[in-house]
């Protein structure tokens, strides 16, 4: 059986959501009376590790229940408006990530496109990154290591041989797959 841990505490329940675009989050229960705080690692024995930040939670009856979000947790914060002139998308992203206390992933795509005039309205860091990603035709997400990735989406080719569809039979299944 695979075991998940956060620090020295065993994870007794974990629902992790990995959106194609955005910040991953984990709703967890830990077998501990000591509440985790700040940056934590969700570790799968013999498997991956996710680096995130505790954003809410509490202890009840010897069990901590809470939410962990990918990265430093700053993309949910409201950032002040900013105006740019003769900048690049890299400049805009760097400011968003600095203001949100986040870090760019080493595998991020090319953000060298010019942004002659760019306005970042007051809003969350996630919304600001979404605007840049839209302008560049990129996707964005927080990776397992906590870094923020923006880049061109690439997916492996899928052939019909890779897909298995259940076939129903009988009169109730007529016209259905």
Language-model features and meaning:
Residues 1-81:
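Assembly/oligomerization scaffold segments
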Residues 44, 82-87, 163-169:
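Short intrinsically disordered coil segments
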Residues 63-65, 70-73, 104-174:
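Short beta-strand-centered interaction patches in the first periplasmic/extracellular domains
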Residues 78-86, 116-119:
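Second-shell loop/turn segments in exported
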Residues 83-87, 91, 123-127:
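Soluble non-cytosolic domains of exported or imported proteins
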Residues 86-105:
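Glycine-rich, acidic and aromatic/proline-enriched surface loops and short helix-turn segments
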Residues 177:
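Short, glycine/charged-rich beta-strand-loop motifs at protein surfaces that mediate ligand recognition
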